[in-house]
Each structure stands twice: as structure tokens, then as C-alpha cells.
Amino acid sequence: MAVQISKKRKFVSDGIFKAELNEFLTRELAEDGYSGVEVRVTPTRTEIIILATRTQNVLGEKGRRIRELTAVVQKRFGFPRGSVELYAEKVATRGLCAIAQAESLRYKLLGGLAVRRACYGVLRFIMESGAKGCEVVVSGKLRGQRAKSMKFVDGLMIHSGDPVNYYVDTAVRHVLLRQGVLGIKVKIMLPWDPSGKIGPKKPLPDHVSIVEPKEEILPTTPVSEQKGAKPEVPVMPQGAPVPTA
């Protein structure tokens, strides 16, 4: 017999499950460009779609790695055998995914690249991918013993209001270097896309669209037309009998 739980508890348990799953996959697939997870629940099974930039690495040789991940998720969250399926989906626009770019910057810094050069490289790639604006902040012991932060900004970025929730993609990552831990924050402002593929369908509240006037079709032959003339009232002849109702 299924245990009945309230709607509030159901929302909380679903949120905890997704947060734990996201944390686990972030640790496991950080090197494979992990960018997020989607959970689809059907009456018969639960489908977990892993979004990554390198899907081949997520799948592994002959699908071995994805099977191992499925077994771990099944055991950890108590799913019945065969009721959970894991899929790997490639991120369509890597440059517009804040998580992918934060991980990219993290590995650049781990590789020994200078902070300024690494940040400008990420900034340029994001803007070339079609973003309206981006902001990269790196903080920590960048030079010397005193901690400071460096901010790199390009394009347009909104910071307040409801549109921030669906127009700005944010990611925070930490990287452990010899001098200490550096914090990385990447914010990307997505472009407006009516199809909803690379950005939100809903335009910004202050967006102004100018409608082009319709083309006026000119007549090929000259036409004379009398406009605004009063209709002529028929004059009754004198001596005619007046009609009565």
C-alpha cells in the first residue's frame, strides 16, 4: 500500500532529491562538462537526463559508465530495480551555459593559465556564442597574500526585477590552487529567442519592437474617385400627390 504524503512534503522531498542528485553528478562528471540535470517522472519509471558538453565520456565505453551511474542512483535513492533510466544529452549552446563556462574557467586556472587571460578567453567565447552580456568574477589570493577580487564585464547585464530569474544564468565554482581557494562566479545574460531554444520566449518588459509600415501599392493607371460628396436627394415634381402611409 502506497504511503500518502501531503503536497508540501512531496515538493520538499522532490527538491531534496534533485539537489542531492545534482551534487552527486557535479562531483562525478565535473571533467566531462556536466551542465545540469532534468528529472521526468512517468507512471512506470523515472527518467534522468544528464546535460553535458562531452556526452561520449558520460556514456563511457559501450555504455559502461552510464550503467554504473544508474546502479549507484538506484541504490542511493531506493528506486525499485529497472524503474530508473539515465540518459546523456549534449548541451546545444555551450557558450550560453554558465555551469559549463565556470567549469571551463576552473580547469584553465588549474592548468596554470593566468587569471586575466583565462577570464578574457571565457568572456570572448560567451559573447561570440550570442549572449547579450556576461560577468566573470574571480576572488581570492590572486597575487600576493592579500585576497582581492577581479571582475570582467562585457555587454548588457540586468541585476534586479523578475526578468533576472529567467534571463540571467548564474554558476559558482571553487578551485583549490597552491596559494589557496579561489572563487569563480559566472553570470550570462541570455538573448531573447521567440522559439525558446537559446533563450527565454518572453521579451524584456522595456523591449520596444518597431513595426515596419506596410508597402503602399501604387495604381498602374490613373483613377479619379470622388470622396466626401453628399448624396443627391431626388427632387419631387410639382403637383405630384404626396404619398400617405
UniProtKB/Swiss-Prot annotation:
The record's annotation in SUPFAM superfamilies points to: Prokaryotic type KH domain (KH-domain type II) (SSF54814), Ribosomal protein S3 C-terminal domain (SSF54821)
Topology relative to the membrane: Peripheral membrane protein
Q: Does the keyword Mitochondrion apply?
A: yes
Q: Which UniProt key words apply to this protein?
A: Apoptosis, Cell cycle, Cell division, Cytoplasm, Cytoskeleton, DNA damage, DNA repair, DNA-binding, Lyase, Membrane, Mitochondrion, Mitochondrion inner membrane, Mitosis, Nucleus, Ribonucleoprotein, Ribosomal protein, RNA-binding, Transcription, Transcription regulation, Translation regulation
**UniProt-listed GO biological process terms:** apoptotic process; cell division; DNA repair; positive regulation of apoptotic signaling pathway; regulation of translation; translation
State a single Pfam family of this protein.
Ribosomal_S3_C
Q: Where in the cell is it found?
A: Cytoplasm; Nucleus; Nucleus, Nucleolus; Mitochondrion inner membrane
- Matching PROSITE patterns: KH_TYPE_2, RIBOSOMAL_S3
- Write one Gene Ontology MF term: class I DNA-(apurinic or apyrimidinic site) endonuclease activity
Entry keyword Transcription: yes
Q: What class of enzyme is it?
A: lyase
Domain spans labelled KH type-2: 21-92
Which Enzyme Commission number(s) are on file for it?
4.2.99.18
What chemistry does it catalyse, as a reaction equation? 2'-deoxyribonucleotide-(2'-deoxyribose 5'-phosphate)-2'-deoxyribonucleotide-DNA = a 3'-end 2'-deoxyribonucleotide-(2,3-dehydro-2,3-deoxyribose 5'-phosphate)-DNA + a 5'-end 5'-phospho-2'-deoxyribonucleoside-DNA + H(+)
Q: Name one GO cellular component term.
A: cytosolic small ribosomal subunit
Family matches, as InterPro entries: KH_dom-like_a/b, KH_dom_type_2, KH_sf_prok-type, Ribosomal_S3_C_sf, Ribosomal_uS3_C, Ribosomal_uS3_CS, Ribosomal_uS3_euk/arc
Family recorded in the similarity comment:
Belongs to the universal ribosomal protein uS3 family.
Briefly, what is this protein's role? Component of the small ribosomal subunit. The ribosome is a large ribonucleoprotein complex responsible for the synthesis of proteins in the cell. Has endonuclease activity and plays a role in repair of damaged DNA. Also involved in other processes including regulation of transcription, translation of its cognate mRNA, spindle formation and chromosome movement during mitosis, and apoptosis.
Instruction: Kindly provide the name given to this protein in its UniProt entry.
Output: Small ribosomal subunit protein uS3
Organism expressing this protein natively: Ictalurus punctatus (Channel catfish)
- This protein's gene is called rps3
